Amino acid sequence: QKYTDKILNAAGLPPECIFLASSLKEAKTLEKIKTLAPDAGLSVMFDYILDKTFLDLFPGGIFNLHPGYLPYNKGAFANVWAIVDQMPAGVTFHVIDEGVDTGAIITQKKVKIEPIDTGETLYRKLEKSGIALFKEAWPSVESRKFSLHPQNPNSGTIHKKSDVEQIDCIDPDKTYKARDLINLLRARTFPSYKGAYFEENGKKIYLELKLYYGDAS
């Protein structure tokens, strides 16, 4: 809802044509969208799973810009898991099906992860690359002159939103490989969001990592 006014002004749409993501499964919302007779839909880094009832409202399909290099890092926090799991990072423009980021790929582009990247800096790079990829791909989608490349259902990785909770709590008495701990901390560094932490005297103490290049000598 943060950019509601900007979206309304840019699209030239009346407020009644804007729907909250949390309402997309409600019958009254689905009926309102149906009356608009949409052809195709566009999802951009959207955090909600769209079910078949919603997908069927768009005869031309719904296309998604995902901040991950599919089939790697399907689902949530693709920027985080690309660093933590050392998987390829990138952006993918694909067709939405009933799975989680499992639809056929139209085009994609890798984004290099630098040693000083954090969850935030990588996300910003993915945003920038995603915009460029969309501008490049949309004309072919609009004219229906694009190829589809099915994903291998047995390859890649997937994560739920809650998966980051399993890595955020750092145990000060646990033995970590230095590289793994550094990757975890930098992946979860995204001010002003809370990320990795440890607990002391009943309180959570949050950690952020600052990285920069220096002289090799």
List each model region and its residues.
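One-carbon transfer enzymes
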Residues: Q1-S217
